[in-house]
């Protein structure tokens, strides 16, 4: 009992004692490519054999020239963080690619621990059309920030219709520049992207700093938050005491009279901490109870490293089943 009480208090205190997220973050831009950026540019599939070797695999990020340019920006702006950008496109399309965000963090992020080399956290990535949802998940795992720049918009005619070019594609107009080497300010309190001196508001970035995402950033990654919530809930339920959560409340989206998709039905049936009778719809952000863990197209040694980092000997003693598919990275399995 004392152990459970101590665990519940320790989880709450260890989180609340963490430093708050910096109100202002200075960044210097680096355009990685124009158009959508596939995660294969960040971590090529033909280099999958080296993904568990962080130092070696980091050498395949984009190109050797790009790596040199990023290093030059870091030397020119030692007090700023490099923000990797997909100009006129979306960052991270195609897959979640944990090794991709690992590489971005290695070159542009912060060292997680001075005792563990080549493992970095807190990268900052951006795209004119934002971050691919599946890639945003892995950005959150590293405590990173994903920015929807909206720096190009469709040019409209007098009737409000997009003006097309000779290829029948919409003509775009630039609302502000993120040319490589541009210094910008991210205000995490007002949730705005500003000019270097903070005088001009460029775009609202509230979607990048929801209460849940702010927790991930503050904790240096989503794993610590998820595990903390699980342990605190378990301790309180076992002791029969009220949960005094230090974490952001769940986001519950409920639309009266609206039916449920198949996925929403499964989600509702397994939601944790939701009042009886509450029906949740898309956009909700709550914990769920799972009994099957699946991982598609997985690099086996990376999974082993993740489990080691969690001090885990098994995937979970509570799930009914777990699987991994090797897919095109099967060659790295022993």
Regions found by a protein language model. Name each.
Residues 38, 46, 50, 65, ...:
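Structural signal for hydrophobic packing residues in well-ordered secondary-structure cores
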Residues 7, 41-194, 201-208:
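Feature captures the catalytic cores and cofactor-binding loops of soluble hydro-lyases/lyases
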Residues 256-280:
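N-terminal basic/disordered segments at the start of proteins
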Residues 35-42, 91-103, 212-231:
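Conserved phosphate/anionic-ligand binding catalytic regions in large, soluble enzymes, centered on
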Residues 38-43, 47-59, 64-65, 69-82, ...:
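Long, structured ligand/cofactor-binding scaffold of large enzymes
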Residues 7, 194-199, 206-263:
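Internal alpha/beta core interface subdomains
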